[in-house]
């Protein structure tokens, strides 16, 4: 069975591009554009990896991870994406349980390599 990725990203363009890329790479994909939707999907579906934008319209992507961890539904791995490079933010992501933090724009080849590493 294919690993499942939950894309949590408020940009429809980015979400659609990632979804197409991941489906072509053989992954099952779910997507959400808000904290509320991502939390609901994460609680309802088995997710292996969450690709998590930190800035969402209704809060922080880290809120999603916290809610899923609290519900016992955290994915095997969470990969945070952000346009910010502050060391404090990176540490906050790691403290919340993220496996890694990638700075946007994320090179596709690097993203796929990191996903394969985290799911391997």
Regions found by a protein language model. Give the residues of each.
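Short amphipathic alpha-helix used as the core "switch/output" element in two-component signaling
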Residues: 62-75
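Acidic catalytic/metal-coordinating carboxylates
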Residues: 34, 60-63
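The feature encodes the CheY-like receiver
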Residues: 57, 86, 105
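C-terminal output helix
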Residues: 106-115
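Acidic, metal-coordinating helix/loop segments flanking the phosphotransfer/catalytic sites
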Residues: 31-49
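Active-site residues of response regulator receiver
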Residues: 53, 82
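Conserved acidic carboxylate
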Residues: 9, 56
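Two-component/phosphorelay signaling modules centered on CheY-like receiver
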Residues: 12-30
């Amino acid at each position: 069975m294919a690993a499942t990725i939950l894309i949590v990203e408020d940009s429809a363009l980015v979400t659609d591009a990632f979804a197409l890329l991941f489906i072509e790479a053989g992954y099952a994909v779910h997507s959400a554009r808000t904290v509320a939707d991502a939390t609901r999907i994460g609680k309802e579906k088995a997710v292996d990896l969450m690709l998590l934008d930190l800035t969402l319209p209704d809060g922080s992507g880290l809120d999603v991870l916290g809610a899923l961890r609290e519900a016992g539904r955290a994915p095997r791995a969470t990969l945070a994406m952000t346009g910010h490079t502050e060391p404090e933010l990176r540490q906050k992501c790691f403290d919340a349980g993220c496996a890694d933090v990638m700075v946007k724009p994320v090179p596709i080849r690097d993203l796929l390599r990191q996903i394969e590493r985290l799911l391997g």
